[in-house]
């Protein structure tokens, strides 16, 4: 199921021209993914202080820019699973302002066993929560 996360660009995320630093685009996608996980599977994400049942690591992320994000803009980040594998999956992120696309990110996540970080098959419950069909 597609998910939308919106955020406003803050001053400290920009250079002197008011344009977002490149590294922040991946941080925005990471934030969108985390919020999506919490919305789709409350309490499932495993992290320090939370013994959840779901954990992933990033294997690859490809960013394509079609325009810059700027100070005080609100960016809408649409997230959808683009591919399901046995122990990995791709999430497509599309960032837009006022309907105009500014960037796209394709991230490959590897599902891992919480605590051991060894690759593990993606559970049916995870596929169901995020929409088992690919885009």
Predicted feature descriptions by range:
Residues 1-76, 82-135:
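Terminal targeting signals and extreme-terminal segments of soluble enzymes
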